[in-house]
Structure formats: C-alpha cells, structure tokens
C-alpha cells in the first residue's frame, strides 16, 4: 500500500475522529475535523449519518482493517513496514498486540514526538531526516530507527542555534512526558528508560483487531 500524499485531515475524517496528525493545529478551531466531521468524498455526509460513519454495518473484516489502518496512520507507517513490525512482534515473548504497539512507540520519530521535541510525528520525521538529532552521540537521519532501554536522544549541537530549537524549551514544557521516557529540557536530551506499558499507549488503538486482521491472511 502506497504512502498517502493527500491532505492528512482527510485521514481523520475517514476514521471519524481526530488522529492529531498536524500537531498544535488539531487543538485549534482551524482543525478541519472541527468544521467537517464527516467522511471525505461525494457521499461523506450520507455515510456519516446516524452516528459517526455508520459503523454498525461493518463486518468483522472491515473493523479489523479499520483498526490496522488507524494505527498505520497514527504512526505514519507504510503497509510493508507495518507488516514487518507485526512479524517481529510474533517472534517476541508476550502478547503479540502489545509487542506491536511497543515497537511502534519505540520508533525514533515517535520518541521525539513523545519527548515534546516536535509537535507531531510528521514534524519529528522531518527533523530527523534533516539530521538534527543524535542517538547515543551519533548523528542519524533514520526516523524508523527502533530505540531500546538506555538510548539517549539529543538535539545535535550544530542545530541548537536554529530558531526552532531556541524556542523549543517553552513548547516542550507544555507537553507532558510519559513515564517511560526521561527528559532534560535545558540540555535538550531525552532517555528511553523502558518500554511503555499498555496503559501508557493510545487507548483508542485496538491491537487485538490488528492481530486478527493479519492472522486471517
């Protein structure tokens, strides 16, 4: 499945709820979902009547597919890579669904977003691609890099003088850091302390439906 290059706000409307893909804009009146909370397309309003997107008619497969697509869109992951994460989660000990969510949460772009160093995962990916971050002292430009306990993420010394990073401390202080991460705003450094527990991950994600989707294929 190819990458969606259209307006990301349509993805929220397709899911029938905010996915917070555009950072701070999603919390303002400028959010497209606030103005048009129905599905995109010619028949979007009709499909949305009767509560949300008329999910009562959905088959089990449709619900499983929707759960998988929602997770993909939240984390900005392509289908091939998402499937690879699922296969890795199968080989790990424990619950496959939780393993999958932990893999997604441990991506570098997501960790940067969770630390408050970016307003969205998309922005975090862009910052990483431009080489503004280091992991354990080494510069990286791979947003999909999977982090582990003890890994240190820092803003590259040469990037700290840029206007965006000069004003970052004010923005970062307004964001709550999850307990599985440790952040030092003054030093512009974050550390992965452990993998997140299920309660610390987006509760609207349904990992069981995702597992069921791939299990039947």
Give the positions of each predicted feature.
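Ferredoxin-like alpha/beta domains used as RNA- or RNAP-binding modules
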Residues: 1-115, 139-217
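Glycine- and Gly-Pro-enriched alpha-helical subdomains that act as flexible
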Residues: 131-135, 139-141
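Internal active-site segments that recognize and position negatively charged phosphoryl groups
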Residues: 114, 118-123
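Short, well-ordered loop/turn sites that connect or cap secondary structure elements
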Residues: 121, 127-128, 147
């Amino acid at each position: 499945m190819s990458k969606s290059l259209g307006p990301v706000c349509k993805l929220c409307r397709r899911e029938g709820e905010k996915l917070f893909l555009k950072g701070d804009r999603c919390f303002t009146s400028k959010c497209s979902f606030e103005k048009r909370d129905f599905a995109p397309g010619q028949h979007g309003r009709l499909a949305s009547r009767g509560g949300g997107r008329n999910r009562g008619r959905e088959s089990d497969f449709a619900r499983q597919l929707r759960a998988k697509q929602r997770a993909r869109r939240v984390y900005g992951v392509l289908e091939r890579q998402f499937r690879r994460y699922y296969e890795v989660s199968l080989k790990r000990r424990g619950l496959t669904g939780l393993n999958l969510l932990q893999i997604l949460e441990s991506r570098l772009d997501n960790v940067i977003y969770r630390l408050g160093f970016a307003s969205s995962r998309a922005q975090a990916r862009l910052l990483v691609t431009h080489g503004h971050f280091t992991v354990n002292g080494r510069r990286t430009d791979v947003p999909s890099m999977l982090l582990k306990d003890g890994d240190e993420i820092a803003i590259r010394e040469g990037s700290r003088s840029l206007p965006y990073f000069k004003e970052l401390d004010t923005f970062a202080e307004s964001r709550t850091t999850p307990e599985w991460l440790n952040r030092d705003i003054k030093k512009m450094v974050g550390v992965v302390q452990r993998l997140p527990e299920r309660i610390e991950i987006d509760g609207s994600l349904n990992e069981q439906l995702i597992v069921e989707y791939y299990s039947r294929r």
